[in-house]
Structures are given as structure tokens and as C-alpha cells.
Amino acid sequence: MSNENDIITPGMQDYINRNNSYLAKRSQYIQDEVKKWKFDTIAVHGLYSVTDAINDYQGSIIEPIFMSTSQAYRDSDEMAAALAYKIPTWCYSRIANPSTYYYEWTLALLEGYGFDGETTCCSTSSGMAAIMTAVQPFLHVYNTPAEPRNFVATAQCYGGTFQQFSIRLMQERNIECRWVLDATNLDEWNSKIDENTRFLYGELPSNPQLSFFDIKAVADLAHSHEIPLICDSTIATPALLRPISHGADIVVQSVTKSLTSSGFGIAGAVIARKNLTSKFSDDELKEDFALNVKLLQNRDFGPNLHPLQAVMSLNDMRTIRSKMDLMSRSTMKIARSLNSHPQVESVQYLGLPDHPQHELASKYMWLVDAEYDELYNKPVNRYGHLMSFCVKGGAEKTRGVFDNLKRIWRATDLGRIKSVATIPAISTHQQQGEEGRKKAGIPANMIRLCVGAEHPDDILADLDQALNAAK
């Protein structure tokens, strides 16, 4: 972001010096104070302090919502320094906003919890915007427009991701996506990589199949080829899984889902480790990926998050650990019950011992800070609140079960405080076609269930009556 032709006036330098001092103090505060906090404390407070509130925001306990398009400056020197990205101001809400800063700082700290290095975050208007924000910088043309470019991704992924990769990138831009069908097979990953591969991409746990892969092994493979690993861990949230601690370079979150469990809006985020691995990128991008894409790429594309939504999502995040614990426990109970139901063909849930990736997921998916809880006093596995099950009798019978649900909401959403179900083949994954669904392992008789905070017995009763009514 620096430019050797920039002219720094004495007045600009004064602003730069003052802001460098501010950044150094904030960094020291994070190291001396925030990094010592438990996960829940970070989720509740982030970097919004009592001092900030009293000195700057008339004592507001909740982060203020800045409903302003742009920022005013004291003089031309401050404006010039700001627009040259020499000082950390927000300039214009298409680029940044004080409300989104608090959102980003909190998510960066949560995804980086337990990680020795630094993490930064770029907010986006949706999860799909987060995915494009994360992958686009690695797909630049460096020599000629005809140069071959490819990337490797898990076939078990969200339907929107499949569309973005297969249609927007492959068909429209001739950038090849090489699908990995068995993400647990490291040889398959390796066989797809060549000198033109820009990054590896994986979703875990995947939606709706609940597949998983070995993050550290795939990250090591990526780094051996000098390319980054990008992970979508929306389903787990940082309360259960933080891929950066296991070697991933970048994490994308559809904050719309579990992190904004109230359902009050659409939001996304890209969280990256500093000094990530990539032989294709410039040094400034690698040094601070999230900040770089925020100030350059996304300034031009415009997928920034609305400040009102930033604070609303931030308030949902404060209790994410407790919610994921509660809903994971409920999902485990429901999955166990459905696993022996006479009308159910199979159940897909990572918490079940008979799931093919149960042992692998158990290495990575833990309720953060459970060892400090009086209730547990030890590390405990939690596998999230998304599960799927296949109904005996085929697609028509499955739709009958689905249509007979009374308490569970029929919708394409997930991550809600209320339980929601859908049939992926006719909704979230219908656009990728039968061949694409077969590749991803999504049969017509699959129902995806995202368990909310209701008592699990009431959800089980609704499922049981729906399964029996459709006999």
C-alpha cells in the first residue's frame, strides 16, 4: 500500500507519528491484557473498553453505530495522510467504519484465540462476499491473460460456494477449480496441485454432508507448495474450531449463520494470519492479508458490511460459546435418537462414533475453555448444531416428512436460535444439478437439520410425528 512517490509533508508526518504511537499502545494493550482473557471475555468486550466509552462515546456500554458515509478531517495534512493509508482512519464507509472495526477486532481475536501469531479481519456484507474476498487476490494474472490458473477445493461444500467456483470462476473466467472428492485422502489433494495452483480451499464441517479433513496435514501440504490454505469453518464457529491455530492461513465465516444466531441480518468475515504463505502474492498482501484486501480490493469492489449490521452481529457473538455448547449437546441427543429410528436410513453427524470422520473431527473440535468451566473441568468435544439424515423410501417420502414438520421451521437458513430444516437437493444445492450433487454426496432423500436452543425432547417429538405421519 506504500508508494515511493508519496510526498510526506511535516504536517502529515506529525499525524503519522501520533497514530503510530496509538497503534503501538493498542498492540501493547492486546498483548498485556486482551491475550490473557478467556474466550468469553473477548467475545463480550473485544477491544471496546470503559475508557473508550467514557472518553469518546458519552459512556455508551454498547459499541456505537456510526450511520455516516464519511469522515471529516482537521486539515489537508490529516486528509492526505488518511487517503494515502498512512494513518488508521476510516475515510468512507465503503472502505471502513468505526462500527465495523469493533466487529473485525473481535472476530480476529476469537479466530486467533490460542494462536501465537497475529490475526486480522476484514468484514464483508455476506458469507459469499467473504469467500470471493478471500480467493480473488490469489487469482490475479501476473504474466499474460492466457496464463493457466487453478485452485483445489473440497467438493463437499455449500451450494453457493459450488456455484461461485464452478460458474463464476470456471465458466466465466476460465479459472479451473479442481474438486477433491475425498478430502481425507491427502494423495488426492496432492495429485491436483501443479505449478499453476494458487491455493487450497476446504469447508469443514461441510454443509450439509458433515464431512471433515485433517487441517494440519492439508495446511502442511499447501505450504510445501508455497500456497495458502483457506478454510470455511462457518458451521463450527471459533467456539469449536479455529483453523488458523492448526496451520490454515485464512478463515472465512458466513457470520449470518451461527455467529448471528438471532437471524437479524446478513454478514461475513475474512480472518487471516499475518505473514501467510503464498508464492504468487506481493509482500504487503502476505504481511497483512485482511487489511490489504480491505483497503485496496474491497475499496474497489464495495462488499463492505453495514455499520448497523456490524453491531447487531457483534451483540450476537457475545454468547457464542454458551450457545454452541447448548445446541451441540442437543444435536448429539437428536442424532443418537434418529440413528435408531425405523424410518431413518442414515444419520450424518460428526459426533456419532459411526461417522467416517468422527475420530478425525474429535482431534480438532473442542468446546473452547471447557477445562475452565465448573461444569466440565476438562476438555470436551463438541460437534456443532448441524446434522443431516436420510429418510427411508426415497425423495417423495422425504418431502412428506418435511411437509409434516410442525415445530421445526422449513427454510434454507441455518445457525438460528430456532431449529430449521431443509431438503438440500431442492433448495440450497439444487442449482448445482444432479451431477454436482452426486459429486458432493447429497442424495434426494436427505434432510438437513440445524438444531436450535429449544429443548431437544420437543424437537425429537416433532421429528418423530413427522416421520410416522409420512409412513
Where are the language model's segments positioned?
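Conserved C-terminal alpha-helix-loop-beta "cap" of PLP-dependent enzymes
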Residues: 45-55, 344-447, 451
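Alpha-helix N-cap recognition
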Residues: 74-76, 111, 126, 455
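Short amphipathic alpha-helical segments
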Residues: 88, 119, 266, 308-309, ...
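Well-ordered alpha/beta subsegment
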Residues: 440, 444, 452-467
